[in-house]
Amino acid sequence: MHIIIAGIDTEVGKTFVSAILATLFQAEYWKPIQSGSLDRSDSTIVRELSGAVCHRETYRLTHPLAAHQAARVDNIPIHAENFSLPVTEAPLIIETSGGFLSPCSQDSLQGDVFSKWPCQWVLVSKAYLGSINHTCLTVEAMRTRNLNILGMVLNQYPKEEEDWLLNMTGIPYLGRLNYENIISKETVKNYANLWKETWEDREAKLCS
């Protein structure tokens, strides 16, 4: 099982979701591109929160910019052919950088590069002004690429807006995130327990 975690934008909760799913499935983790925060990378955070084995990033860029910009500043050209799925028999959680259609290189988008892999996708949407539009546009872009969308995780939406989004997009609900002042290993474990039944039901439907 390979699951790619995509977002409608940057800073929507992808790393938090990755840690939860790594805990839930005892999965390994991989982030193909890390831009900035190399001393406190998303791989480091996921490892601390879940204990997951984390595969080294293909590209480690020093500036917290979009991948193509960070690569330009570092003078490290990104080539799509350099990305390859880590070899593992364990479930694998893959976290993209930024939003679904964020640049991967000077001439490619992450959504196009990573959609070539035989993976399932989870979309993370966080409530902010304009997020409903961004969510609907992202779902449309994912469907245009015929991706296997497992479902959506909703971050800090009011219940009525959750219902509206799920009804309008037709994307299955996989869990919600509340505002957390501090995210700890215990927080992640609690969410994994909360989501367990929803994910088991989703897996059962996929197998039926």
From Swiss-Prot:
<comment type="pathway">
    <text>Cofactor biosynthesis; biotin biosynthesis; biotin from 7,8-diaminononanoate: step 1/2.</text>
</comment>
<keyword id="KW-0436">Ligase</keyword>
<dbReference type="GO" id="GO:0005524">
    <property type="term" value="F:ATP binding"/>
</dbReference>
<keyword id="KW-0067">ATP-binding</keyword>
<keyword id="KW-0460">Magnesium</keyword>
<dbReference type="GO" id="GO:0004141">
    <property type="term" value="F:dethiobiotin synthase activity"/>
</dbReference>
<feature type="binding site">
    <location>
        <position position="42"/>
    </location>
    <ligand>
        <name>Mg(2+)</name>
    </ligand>
</feature>
<comment type="similarity">
    <text>Belongs to the dethiobiotin synthetase family.</text>
</comment>
<keyword id="KW-0547">Nucleotide-binding</keyword>
<protein>
    <recommendedName>
        <fullName>ATP-dependent dethiobiotin synthetase BioD</fullName>
        <ecNumber>6.3.3.3</ecNumber>
    </recommendedName>
</protein>
<feature type="binding site">
    <location>
        <begin position="11"/>
        <end position="16"/>
    </location>
    <ligand>
        <name>ATP</name>
    </ligand>
</feature>
<feature type="active site">
    <location>
        <position position="31"/>
    </location>
</feature>
<dbReference type="Pfam" id="PF13500">
    <property type="entry name" value="AAA_26"/>
</dbReference>
<comment type="function">
    <text>Catalyzes a mechanistically unusual reaction, the ATP-dependent insertion of CO2 between the N7 and N8 nitrogen atoms of 7,8-diaminopelargonic acid (DAPA, also called 7,8-diammoniononanoate) to form a ureido ring.</text>
</comment>
<dbReference type="GO" id="GO:0005829">
    <property type="term" value="C:cytosol"/>
</dbReference>
<keyword id="KW-0963">Cytoplasm</keyword>
<keyword id="KW-0093">Biotin biosynthesis</keyword>
<feature type="binding site">
    <location>
        <begin position="95"/>
        <end position="98"/>
    </location>
    <ligand>
        <name>ATP</name>
    </ligand>
</feature>
<feature type="binding site">
    <location>
        <position position="42"/>
    </location>
    <ligand>
        <name>ATP</name>
    </ligand>
</feature>
<dbReference type="InterPro" id="IPR004472">
    <property type="entry name" value="DTB_synth_BioD"/>
</dbReference>
<feature type="binding site">
    <location>
        <position position="15"/>
    </location>
    <ligand>
        <name>Mg(2+)</name>
    </ligand>
</feature>
<dbReference type="GO" id="GO:0009102">
    <property type="term" value="P:biotin biosynthetic process"/>
</dbReference>
<dbReference type="GO" id="GO:0000287">
    <property type="term" value="F:magnesium ion binding"/>
</dbReference>
<feature type="binding site">
    <location>
        <position position="95"/>
    </location>
    <ligand>
        <name>Mg(2+)</name>
    </ligand>
</feature>
<feature type="binding site">
    <location>
        <begin position="155"/>
        <end position="156"/>
    </location>
    <ligand>
        <name>ATP</name>
    </ligand>
</feature>
<feature type="binding site">
    <location>
        <position position="35"/>
    </location>
    <ligand>
        <name>substrate</name>
    </ligand>
</feature>
<keyword id="KW-0479">Metal-binding</keyword>
<comment type="subunit">
    <text>Homodimer.</text>
</comment>
<dbReference type="InterPro" id="IPR027417">
    <property type="entry name" value="P-loop_NTPase"/>
</dbReference>
